[in-house]
């Protein structure tokens, strides 16, 4: 089995998360904190560090990641770059929205979908994990806030998990590989229908805002250490000469990042690890330099960036997006250090392929537009879609791709309207990278 070291490395990552929780938090408060996480509504923005303490938040992240690894291993999901995406997403969002209880009904629904189609669950295991973007719906219904109960929560969660595989397969194609958080777009569409129906039946969901502050030094040291370990491992301990690892990373920077771009299969372990570490440092630098906070949500955003560093993101295509969000802070009626904008700064890098494919000026434009669109995209779904930036990114990708393509076609005749992928579900076969276009 290729990339067999992913599982041991991921377990070490989980152990690191637990160590952070135990060292920075009070061990005696971890179990009560985990119970509080389970018994709390998880709509955006619910920072587990704020409501349950840093110890419980990081232990929850480790447990959710271990559960995800177990599902991937038992289902024999093929190991590739997208496996690292799943690890980053599940660990990151387990700091603000996903917990060891609310993810199960959705996973069950996808499992039933695979059984109905008489296909191996391994084909849909990654979809089942990503579908937990709507885990806050399960928590809301299960906690019986005058509407619903645990059985309705299991049923609704299973329905969500059941319908998202075909829906996400369709939405993947219409975005032309320009939105990396495809599941966020699919979940946003589903939530746009689901939440109004729930409201019509008597539900009264409320958008939350729990945001921890004061952890920049501690979490900055922990995150910076993790990123440096990844970079040094890629350079020195990956079985390749340092010059070869660095040369591979430089070639990686020339790609567009258009989905699907599996960097692990395209360039190998060393350049991918370097890319993950560098991008993590970039994300942390933007947050700290803009006066933001390192906490559950922002650390979740950085973990997501690091995960997608194995599947489309690199320094050259994500930096213009982030600069576009910063530019928006000088023009719009909001501040760059507002909590929602800090998340847009990190998660807006879902549009990194636009920057890589069309050029950095269009990346800045996409980031600029995203910084405003995302602030309103979550309103119809009451914060129930954790991947709200993916929903906003999908809307912008669908609008911007044909407009930009048509606008610059006379200078870039090689641009094509047709998508080049047919199968959204990851398989363990070689990936052909998208063409790299250079200015003539």
What is each PLM-predicted segment?
Residues 64-67, 82-93, 104-114, 127-133, ...:
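Short, structured motif recognition centered on aromatic/hydrophobic residues
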Residues 1-98, 231-243, 264-273, 281-288, ...:
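N-terminal signal-anchor module of multipass membrane proteins
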């Amino acid at each position: 089995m290729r990339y067999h070291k992913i599982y041991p490395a991921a377990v070490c990552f989980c152990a690191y998360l637990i160590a952070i929780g135990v060292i920075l938090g009070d061990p005696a408060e971890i179990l009560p904190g985990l119970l509080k996480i389970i018994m709390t509504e998880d709509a955006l923005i619910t920072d587990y560090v704020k409501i349950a303490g840093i110890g419980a938040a990081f232990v929850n992240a480790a447990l959710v990641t271990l559960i995800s690894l177990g599902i991937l291993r038992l289902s024999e999901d093929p190991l590739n770059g997208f496996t690292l995406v799943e690890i980053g997403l599940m660990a990151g969002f387990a700091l603000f929205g996903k917990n060891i209880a609310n993810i199960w009904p959705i996973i069950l629904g996808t499992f039933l979908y695979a059984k109905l189609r008489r296909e191996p669950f391994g084909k849909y295991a990654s979809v089942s994990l990503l579908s937990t973007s709507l885990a806050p719906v399960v928590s809301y219904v299960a906690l019986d806030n005058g509407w619903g109960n645990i059985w309705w929560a299991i049923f609704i969660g299973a329905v969500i998990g059941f319908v998202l595989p075909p829906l996400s397969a369709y939405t993947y194609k219409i975005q032309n590989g320009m939105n990396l958080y495809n599941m966020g777009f699919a979940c946003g569409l589903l939530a746009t229908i689901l939440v109004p129906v729930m409201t019509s039946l008597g539900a009264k969901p409320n958008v939350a805002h729990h945001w921890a502050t004061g952890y920049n030094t501690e979490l900055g040291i922990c995150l910076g250490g993790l990123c440096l370990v990844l970079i040094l491992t890629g350079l020195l301990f990956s079985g390749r000469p340092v010059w070869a690892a660095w040369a591979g990373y430089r070639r990686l920077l020339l790609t567009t990042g258009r989905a699907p771009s599996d960097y692990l299969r395209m360039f190998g372990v060393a350049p991918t690890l370097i890319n993950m570490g560098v991008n993590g440092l970039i994300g942390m630098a933007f947050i700290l330099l803009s006066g933001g906070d390192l906490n559950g949500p922002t650390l979740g955003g950085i973990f997501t960036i690091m995960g997608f560093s194995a599947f489309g993101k690199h320094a050259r295509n994500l930096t213009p997006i982030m600069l576009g969000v910063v530019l928006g802070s000088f023009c719009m009626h909001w501040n760059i250090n507002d909590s929602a904008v800090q998340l847009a700064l990190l998660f807006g890098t879902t549009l990194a392929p636009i920057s890589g494919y069309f050029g950095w000026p269009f990346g800045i434009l996409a980031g600029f537009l995203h910084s405003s669109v995302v602030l309103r995209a979550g309103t119809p779904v009451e914060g129930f879609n954790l991947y709200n930036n993916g929903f906003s990114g999908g809307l912008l990708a669908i609008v911007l791709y044909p407009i930009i393509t048509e606008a610059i076609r006379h200078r870039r005749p090689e641009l094509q309207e047709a998508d080049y992928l047919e199968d959204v579900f990851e398989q363990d076969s070689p990936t052909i990278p998208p063409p790299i276009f250079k200015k003539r």
